[in-house]
């Protein structure tokens, strides 16, 4: 047995060493369900274009598609008196230095919330290392993971010795599907869904995006670890057939080192399997940073719509009878609730908040309140201690700005 293990290790080391000098990244998920490939295509004598492909059980999911980011660091470079010739596209003159394959990961962990108490995290991983040879010291890594649930990749900027700031102005990532693919689209959260051919998606649509392929496969395009980035949507390419391009809501100013959100491509034989495999998103999100999580108690919530004491008492009774742990007062429990003139420290007269909260405690039902962004920005420091004093157990922030990088980090 020891000899067999030694031989296997020797073979693995040999493969990894060889892969380190390769210009192409090929990766397969632990059970061979998903496969991904990244490589550069020479477009001209001075231009390299990064492309990738994704397969599911040997069938094409995403055909040859562009990958990368567009940066505009000219202002910073001029401020440092650096004379660098700006390529038409920042990715054009990057060259692959190496491809390194990491050890396989196979573990389980317990989330604070979700559909399952135990999540299986198993994947194979590799990183492609690129750099510019023009004296600029720019580097970019493409980190790739292959799960049986899907493929994930992100762009990582190692720390730059001079250009502290990077300005990302465009996401070049594309998704090319076979002719006949259709997507179930929505232009904003909670918008009506519209089934459109890929070429007919003329306005940016939300992610997660579900795509139905002519070969019978179902695909989901989504992302993870997005709290330090702007909103990114999908739209049909104006120049390439059956291809979706990425649309950033705003530029993103970053300080290296820095990792972008994970891009996720899931494929399945049935659409329901995409939902069953959604643990991939939690696996790609960063671990919880809160040490003491005993106070976090996930659960269902029911909205009380009358904003009256009597209505709240009745709703709490219903929640208690049906094992719903929380009740929500949405807008209009303070007024005016959509204006800077609103005061979230004062409850409307028809609602006896202390009585309702006390009754909820008797019944084991916690009370949540909605607070508009106007009041949050104006009263945050005094409001949260006050709500805690009242016995409110949670706050739903309402109508917050979210699309730009600034508001995503807020």
Which residues fall in each region the model found?
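Short amphipathic alpha-helical segments and helix-helix/interface helices
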Residues: 172, 208-210, 316, 357, ...
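Bacterial Sec-dependent N-terminal signal peptides
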Residues: 1-23
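An acidic-aromatic substrate-binding cleft motif
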Residues: 255-326
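Aromatic- and carboxylate-enriched substrate-binding clefts and catalytic-loop regions
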Residues: 331-410
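Conserved, mostly hydrophobic/aromatic
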Residues: 155, 319, 398
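N-terminal accessory beta-strand-rich subdomains and adjacent acidic, glycine-rich linkers
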Residues: 22-284
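An acidic- and aromatic-residue-enriched active-site/binding cleft used to recognize and process polar
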Residues: 41, 147, 160, 180, ...
């Amino acid at each position: 047995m020891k000899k067999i293990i030694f031989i296997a290790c020797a073979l693995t080391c040999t493969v990894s060493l060889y892969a380190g000098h390769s210009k192409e990244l090929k990766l397969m998920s632990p059970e061979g369900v998903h496969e991904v490939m990244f490589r550069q295509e020479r477009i001209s004598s001075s231009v390299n274009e990064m492309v990738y492909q994704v397969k599911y059980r040997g069938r094409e999911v995403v055909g040859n598609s562009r990958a990368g980011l567009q940066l505009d660091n000219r202002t910073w470079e001029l401020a440092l008196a650096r004379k660098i010739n700006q390529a038409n596209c920042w990715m054009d003159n990057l060259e692959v230095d190496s491809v390194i394959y990491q050890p396989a990961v196979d573990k389980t962990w317990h989330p604070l919330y979700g559909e399952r108490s135990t999540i299986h995290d198993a994947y194979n991983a590799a990183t492609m290392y690129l750099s510019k040879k023009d004296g600029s010291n720019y580097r970019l890594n493409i980190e790739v993971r292959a799960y049986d649930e899907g493929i994930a990749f992100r762009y990582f900027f190692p720390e730059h010795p001079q250009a502290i700031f990077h300005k990302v102005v465009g996401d070049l990532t594309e998704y090319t599907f076979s002719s006949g693919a259709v997507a179930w689209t929505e232009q904003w959260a909670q918008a009506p869904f519209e089934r459109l051919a890929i070429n007919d998606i003329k306005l940016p649509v939300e992610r997660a995006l579900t795509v139905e392929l002519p070969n019978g496969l179902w695909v989901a395009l989504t992302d993870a670890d997005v709290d330090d980035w702007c909103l990114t949507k999908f739209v049909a390419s104006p120049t390439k057939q059956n291809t979706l391009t990425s649309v950033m809501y705003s530029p993103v100013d970053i300080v290296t080192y820095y990792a972008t959100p994970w891009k996720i491509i899931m494929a399945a034989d049935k659409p329901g399997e995409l939902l069953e495999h959604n643990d991939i998103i939690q696996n790609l999100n960063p671990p919880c940073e809160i040490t003491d999580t005993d106070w976090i108690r996930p659960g269902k919530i029911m909205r009380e719509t009358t904003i009256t004491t009597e209505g709240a008492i009745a709703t709490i009774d219903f929640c208690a009878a049906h094992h719903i742990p929380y009740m929500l007062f949405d807008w209009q429990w303070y007024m005016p609730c959509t204006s800077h003139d609103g005061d979230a420290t004062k409850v409307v007269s028809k609602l006896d908040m202390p009585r309702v909260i006390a009754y909820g405690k008797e019944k084991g039902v916690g009370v949540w309140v909605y607070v508009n962004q106007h009041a949050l920005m104006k009263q945050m420091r005094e409001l949260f201690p006050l709500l805690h004093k009242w016995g409110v157990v949670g706050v739903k922030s309402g109508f917050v700005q979210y699309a730009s990088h600034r508001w995503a980090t807020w």
